């Protein structure tokens, strides 16, 4: 209720009290000729009581409405508190993930990379780069070098396989030549024996 409504209610209460006292006095003492009619005072009292009842009903409705609004605000506050706790939990979880990530031994630290100084000698255009960009450039250069070496390795492996195949073919040819030579030598033994006998 507003302050004006409360003030009006208090005024009505005061006038109601006055009317009640007036009725009480009339019952206690005999009426004078100029006194008001008790029925008229009762009607005034009833009208004041109706005003008070209406004020009471309005104040009750306002109380119910205030309780509803308070419950809604409390619910919103509880939901906001729950959301805040969820955000704090997420924040803590993300901090833990970041901490674990920062403490983790990264694979690039175990790679035998070229030093920053050597890289900058070969690539002076990266001298003004920050550490992150410089590391990315070193890793990219390392990747290109490894891809080049991998391609070279594949070519050498193909060449090795071709040489092995060629050597195998030549070895087979030599073995066949040896076999033919052995066969020839074996077949020439009787001829040699014949010439040895005839030459004696």
Swiss-Prot record:
Tell me which Gene Ontology terms the entry assigns under biological process: mRNA processing; poly(A)+ mRNA export from nucleus; RNA splicing
Key words, A-Z:
Cytoplasm, mRNA processing, mRNA splicing, mRNA transport, Nucleus, Transport
* Disruption of the gene: reported phenotype: Results in increased levels of H/ACA box and C/D box snoRNAs.
Gene Ontology terms: cellular component: cytosol; nucleus; THO complex part of transcription export complex
Q: Which Pfam families does the annotation name?
A: FmiP_Thoc5 (PF09766)
Name the job this protein performs.
Component the THO subcomplex of the TREX complex, which operates in coupling transcription elongation to mRNA export. The THO complex is recruited to transcribed genes and moves along the gene with the elongating polymerase during transcription. THO is important for stabilizing nascent RNA in the RNA polymerase II elongation complex by preventing formation of DNA:RNA hybrids behind the elongating polymerase. The THO complex is also required to maintain TRAMP complex occupancy at sites of snoRNA transcription thus promoting exosome-mediated degradation of snoRNA precursors.
Tell me, how does this one assemble? Component of the THO and TREX complexes.
- What name does UniProt use for this protein? THO complex subunit tho5
Gene that produces this protein = tho5
């Amino acid at each position: 209720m507003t302050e004006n409504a409360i003030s009006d209610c208090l005024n009505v209460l005061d006038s109601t009290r006055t009317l009640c006292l007036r009725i009480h006095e009339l019952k206690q003492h005999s009426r004078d000729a100029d006194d008001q009619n008790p029925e008229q005072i009762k009607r005034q009292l009833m009208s004041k009581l109706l005003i008070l009842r209406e004020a009471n009903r309005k104040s009750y409705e306002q109380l119910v409405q205030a309780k509803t609004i308070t419950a809604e605000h409390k619910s919103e506050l509880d939901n906001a508190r729950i959301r805040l706790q969820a955000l704090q939990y997420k924040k803590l979880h993300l901090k833990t993930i970041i901490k674990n990530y920062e403490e983790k031994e990264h694979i690039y630290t175990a790679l035998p990379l070229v030093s920053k100084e050597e890289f900058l000698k070969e690539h002076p255009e990266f001298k003004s780069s920050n550490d992150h960009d410089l590391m990315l450039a070193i890793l990219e250069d390392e990747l290109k070098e490894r891809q080049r070496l991998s391609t070279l390795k594949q070519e050498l492996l193909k060449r090795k396989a071709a040489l092995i195949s060629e050597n195998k073919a030549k070895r087979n040819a030599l073995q066949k030549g040896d076999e033919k030579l052995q066969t020839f030598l074996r077949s020439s033994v009787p001829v040699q024996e014949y010439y040895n006998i005839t030459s004696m």
